[in-house]
Design a protein with these regions (language model features):
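Alpha-helical transmembrane segments in inner-membrane proteins
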Residues: 1-334
Length: 334
């Protein structure tokens, strides 16, 4: 833990916000089309309809906004899930959320010939929410109620089921593969602000709920027996965490598709910086998640110019070594 007191943590938040703003600006400027900081400033002050100005305002600005907000949502979701399940490798994949979203998109494409990104977004949100609710219900069965191990097992089972069904439908209809493959890889390219704004209220509600229960999560993280001994209603806390997870991850998947590793990597980096106080973990996760996804998106544009790599592949390249490191060290991030 590097930031040992609240004063240092506040300074760390300010530095993180400044770094996020800096990378956000670079995200608007960098890409296949050659633009400069001066051109970017003129695009906002004196828009003239040129190709450079259109690219900056209509393509890169929405892309940077979406990358920031989606990265933030995924990182906060990862922190919530790791607290809920006591699993240091937990992420939205754990609850079958990504698989559920992909399955609903493929169903819409296969049976109803839906192929627009706007429709994909709502199908993905419904699929993510349905998967999360089913897993939560299955994990709550039995006399003990919801337990981390039952939730993990239910999530793994549902993820496997949704993935199997989705791949089965794609094999039966290979023409649908090309239309959905880029979305399934996870990307912020070509996503409109209209899609983001349609789910933004759910993201805001999920984030506010997470911040409101952050102190209760500190008590819950001591162990359920200790939390109950201190008078906490652990069932209510787990339910609220689950609602926040579904709102945040469902919205993020709806906008950008299934993007992995942000939810695993960022909480460990943040815990190494600020310790185990969720009142600080969650805001730091929000900032760091936005930074990491923006960096991954910039790399996705530049690594194979003029071609673009889906940002989900870039996050996998960044996250896989870190994932292996965490697994080898038994999930200890600090």
């Amino acid at each position: 833990m590097l930031l040992l007191n609240n004063r240092r943590r506040i300074i760390g938040l300010i530095i993180g916000l400044l770094l996020l703003c800096t990378i956000f600006i670079f995200s608007i400027v960098l890409g296949y089309a050659d633009t400069s900081f001066k051109t970017a400033i003129k695009a906002f002050q004196q828009f003239n309809g040129s190709n450079e100005h259109i690219i900056i305002k209509e393509v890169r600005l929405p892309r940077a906004l979406i990358g920031t907000i989606v990265g933030s949502s995924l990182a906060i979701t990862g922190a919530l899930l790791q607290a809920l399940t006591k699993n240091p490798l937990a992420s939205p994949d754990l609850l079958g959320i990504n698989s559920g979203a992909s399955f609903f998109v493929i169903i819409g494409l296969f049976f109803f010939s839906i192929n627009s990104l706007q429709a994909f977004a709502w199908l993905a949100f419904l699929g993510a929410a349905a998967a999360g609710l089913i897993v939560y219900f299955l994990g709550s069965l039995g006399n003990e109620g919801l337990t981390p191990i039952k939730l993990t097992l239910a999530g793994a089972a549902m993820a496997a089921m949704f993935s199997s069904f989705a791949h089965g439908f794609l094999v039966m209809n290979e023409s649908a593969l090309e239309e959905v493959l880029f979305w399934m890889a996870g990307s912020v390219q070509g996503r409109s602000l209209e899609i983001l704004f349609s789910v933004l209220p759910y993201m805001i509600m999920g984030t506010l709920l997470a911040f409101l229960i952050s102190n209760k999560m500190n008590v819950y993280s001591m162990g359920e027996d200790v939390a109950r001994g201190l008078g906490q209603r652990t069932g209510t806390v787990k339910l609220l965490i689950g609602i926040s997870v579904i709102l945040l991850s469902g919205s993020a998947v709806a906008v950008a598709g299934p993007i992995g590793f942000i939810g695993i990597v960022v909480p460990h980096i943040v815990k190494w910086l600020v310790g185990n106080d969720y009142r600080w973990i969650l805001p730091f996760c929000g900032i760091t998640g936005g930074i990491l996804l923006l960096l991954a998106d910039i790399g996705a544009r530049l690594i194979l110019m003029p071609q673009e790599v889906p940002v989900g592949i870039m996050t996998a390249i960044i996250g896989t070594p870190f994932f292996i490191y965490i697994a080898r060290n038994g999930g200890k991030s600090s």
